[in-house]
Each structure stands twice: as C-alpha cells, then as structure tokens.
C-alpha cells in the first residue's frame, strides 16, 4: 500500500490506519510499527472500516477511507474530500466520469447538486445508467458520525456483507448533506492483476517524467525513460532515450545520461557525462565533470572531479 499511504501522508492526516486480513504478517512487518487493524472475517467494506474503530479511538476529526490497491490517487484529491466535509458536508464521495461507465456504480444527484444515493450498475434504471458520474469508492466522513452509522448498517443483502456505501442512506435519512468531488478516472484504478499493475506503472511513470521535465530536465524521448520515485534529477540535466534511473539516484545539474544506461544508487555532481551503455551500481559517486563512457560498470566507487573512464571498464571498491 506504499503509494496509497504516501498520498494519504502528503494530504496531512494525523494518523494513517491500515486495515489488514489476519494472514498479513509480511505487510505488518513492512508497516514497521505504524497503526493497523485486523478485519477478522471478510464481511464487506463496512466491516473493514468498523474494524479500525478501536485503533482510531475517540478521534473527532475527519476520516478518509481509501483502498490500498488504488496507487494513483493523489494527495490533492484527498485534501479536496476533507475540505468538502470541513465545509459542512456529512460525507464527501470521490466521483469520476469515465468514457464508458458500464459496470460502475452511479452517484445519483439531487436537485441541489448533492448526492441522493449510490446505485450499482446492475440495480440502476435506464435513466440512472445514463448518469456519467460514477462512484470512486473513496470518501471522507467525520469520524464520530462514521462509526455511529457503521453501527447501524446491516448485512441484509445478496452477499450477506456490510457495505460502507450504506452509510450514505443513513446520513440522508438523518437529514445530513452528502456531496461529491470529481477526480480523474485513473486515480481510482484498482490493481487486481499483472495487467492492471502494468497500466498503473505506466501512469505513474508518466507522472514522474512530467514532474522532471516541468522541473527543467530535458528528455528527448520521455516515453522510453524509466524513473524511480525517489530519483532526484536537477535542472538542465539531459536524459537520452532508453535510460533507467533507479532507486537512490541523484543526478546533478547539467549532467547528461546517454542512451541505454542503467543507474541505481548513484550520485552524480554537475555536468557529468554518462554512457551510452553505462551501468552505475549502488555506491557510485561522481564529482563535477566526470565522464563514464560506453560499457563501463561501476560499484562502490568514487570518481573525483574531471575523472574519466571512457570505455570497457569495471571499477569496483575504488577511488579515482
């Protein structure tokens, strides 16, 4: 859930609680002491959120409920949902407008622009199926009201599960206002298989490339460049086609990474020239003006200002 939790953290909540299944020891270890709750039985989304009650405690702020398998959600969208509740809505729901809404639940509006109900596609009337606004599944609710409504929902449905979306009907019955915030369709894309994973990776890579170019980095064929999310590339750097910049890299101002180079854990000063066909492995440090040429591999090596390794070389555990 790293991408989702990173977005939540950037949105500024006081606490992030992850709801897990009982057989989630690996994820619990990965959380490294961060709060989590266990949903003992898989009894629906409402039951999953209710499982966090004891961990959340008496918090009287705003709860944002999101899915760990939607890595493309942004902090700005989560903030917009929280702001909607802070402005007076009892519940704020993320909505999106896909090119083809078939199969998605619809957010049925009322006359005042609020949400009257959520209806699944299979249960929708022909008129409701013409509604473009679909349920993104992410919502913000004031915490005390959230758990009060969850205590009132039932599992009287075909699946015998407790649905989080049932709190909308309860809120409206209590005379409360339910609003929506429109977000991009890609933000609610779930990752359920390897095909979804590839699509999500492509979308995230596009975001990383755009951010780098907006920061002053030149990419001559950006669709062929692959970046780690933690890579730092300073302005006026030039990245040629078919380059991989992996985890832990820092590329200095004005440096050039030429085609078919692969970097991981490397730190480059300003105006370095890397590649083509160079491989920089973890522990590589290059000061200003270093040249590492074609078919050169480095690991745990420091190259001082102006040093050159032009071609066909392995440098390991060295200082040049």
Residue ranges of predicted features:
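Structural beta-sheet core signal
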Residues: 18, 64-65, 91-94, 180
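Conserved N-terminal catalytic core of the sugar/cofactor nucleotidyltransferase
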Residues: 1-83
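Left-handed beta-helix
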Residues: 156-320
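Short, high-confidence coil segments that cap the C-terminus of an alpha-helix
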Residues: 13, 60, 87-91, 176
């Amino acid at each position: 859930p790293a991408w989702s939790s990173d977005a939540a953290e950037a949105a500024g909540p006081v606490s992030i609680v992850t709801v897990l299944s009982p057989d989630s020891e690996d994820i619990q270890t990965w959380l490294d002491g961060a709060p989590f709750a266990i949903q003992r039985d898989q009894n629906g989304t409402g039951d999953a959120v209710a499982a966090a009650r004891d961990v959340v405690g008496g918090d009287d702020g705003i709860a944002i409920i999101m899915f760990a398998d939607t890595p493309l959600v942004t902090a700005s969208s989560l903030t917009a949902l929280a702001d909607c509740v802070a402005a007076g809505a009892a519940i704020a729901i993320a909505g999106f407008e896909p090119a083809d809404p078939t199969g998605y639940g619809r957010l049925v509006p009322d006359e005042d622009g609020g949400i009257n109900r959520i209806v699944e596609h299979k249960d929708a009337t022909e008129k409701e199926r013409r509604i473009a606004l679909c349920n993104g599944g992410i919502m913000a609710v004031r915490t005390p009201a959230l758990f009060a409504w969850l205590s009132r929902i039932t599992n009287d449905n075909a699946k015998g599960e407790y649905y989080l979306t049932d709190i909308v009907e309860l809120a409206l019955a209590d005379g409360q206002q339910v609003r929506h915030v429109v977000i991009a369709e890609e933000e609610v894309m779930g990752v359920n298989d390897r095909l979804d994973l590839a699509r999500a990776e492509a979308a995230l890579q596009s975001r990383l490339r755009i951010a780098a170019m907006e920061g002053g980095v030149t990419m001559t064929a950006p669709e062929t460049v692959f970046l780690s999310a933690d890579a730092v590339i300073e302005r006026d750097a030039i990245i040629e086609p078919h380059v991989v910049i992996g985890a832990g890299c820092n590329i200095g101002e004005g440096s050039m990474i030429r085609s078919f180079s692969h970097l991981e854990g490397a730190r480059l000063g300003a105006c370095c020239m890397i590649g083509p066909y160079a491989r920089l492995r973890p522990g590589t440090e290059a000061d200003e003006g270093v040249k590492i040429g074609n078919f050169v591999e480095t690991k745990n090596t420091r190259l001082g200002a102006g040093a050159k390794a032009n071609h066909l070389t392995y440098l390991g555990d060295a200082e040049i």
